[in-house]
Regions:
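Beta1/beta-strand and adjacent pyrophosphate-binding region of the FAD-binding site
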Residues: 3-19, 37-39
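N-terminal FAD cofactor-binding segment of flavoenzymes
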Residues: 46-94
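Short, mixed charged/polar active-site loops
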Residues: 6, 93-97, 162-166
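Conserved Rossmann-like nucleotide-cofactor binding loop
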Residues: 19, 23, 44
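Predominantly flavin-linked oxidoreductase catalytic cores and closely associated redox partners
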Residues: 26, 46, 127-178
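Short beta-strand to alpha-helix junction loop
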Residues: 60, 105-127
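Active-site acidic short loop of glycosyltransferases
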Residues: 8-9, 33, 168-170
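Glycine-rich FAD pyrophosphate-binding loop
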Residues: 28-53
Length: 178
C-alpha cells in the first residue's frame, strides 16, 4: 500500500519503553511547545508483571524520576522504596537468614526504588499522553530516511492491522532497545 501523507512533528521517539517514555516526558516538561510522537511496537498497556532490566533504581535514578520528571507521587503510591544497594555474601550458606548482609540500616536521604516495570511503563504511557505527547502503540517502524541537510527526517511505520504510515520530524531518536 502507498503511504498516506506524513504527519509532521518536532521529535519522533522510536521506542515506548522506559527510556523513550521518560525522554518524551522530560522533553514536554522542559519544552511544552514541542510536538512529540512516540512509536512503540508492542501493545499498551503492557502486562503488569513485566520483568526487564532497570527494575531497581539507584539514588541518582530516583532523583531523576522524582525531581526532573515529577513522578514522586507515583513512586510513593505504586512502587517499593528500598534502602539503596545491598550485598549478600553466602559464605557457603543456603539459608538467607544465615548469610552476611552489607548495606544501609536506615533510610537514606535520597530514596531508591524497586520499580515494577509493567506498572511504571503503563503509568508513563498514560502520563505522556496527559502531557500532550502523541503515543502510538503497535507501530512497527519499517525504515528511516535521515536527511543530509535541514530537511526533516522521515520514519515509515506499519500499524498492526492497518496501513503503512509515515511521519517527519527535525529530530528522530532511537530508544527501541534490543
Amino acid at each position: 500500500m502507498k503511504p498516506s501523507s506524513p504527519t509532521s512533528h518536532d521529535v519522533i521517539i522510536v521506542g515506548g519503553g522506559l527510556a523513550g517514555l521518560t525522554l518524551a516526558l522530560q522533553l514536554r516538561r522542559r519544552f511544552p511547545e514541542l510536538d512529540v510522537l512516540v512509536l512503540e511496537r508492542h501493545a499498551h498497556p503492557v502486562p503488569e508483571a513485566c520483568h526487564k532490566v532497570g527494575e531497581s533504581s539507584v539514588e541518582i535514578g530516583a532523583h531523576y524520576f522524582e525531581n526532573v520528571l515529577g513522578l514522586k507521587q507515583h513512586l510513593m503510591e505504586r512502587q517499593l522504596k528500598k534502602f539503596g544497594f545491598r550485598f549478600f555474601f553466602s559464605d557457603g550458606q543456603r539459608d538467607l537468614a544465615a548469610v552476611t548482609e552489607l548495606g544501609a540500616s536506615r533510610p537514606l536521604p535520597v530514596p531508591s526504588w524497586q520499580i515494577d516495570r509493567g506498572i511504571f511503563e503503563n503509568f508513563l504511557g498514560e502520563e505522556v499522553q496527559r502531557q500532550g505527547v502523541r503515543f502510538v502503540d503497535q507501530a512497527v517502524v519499517r525504515c528511516f530516511e535521515l536527511s543530509q541537510d535541514d530537511a526533516p527526517h522521515r520514519v515509515s511505520l506499519h500499524r498492526v492491522g492497518g496501513d503503512v504510515q509515515s511521519a517527519i520530524a527535525r529530530w528522530v531518536i532511537d530508544a527501541s532497545g534490543c
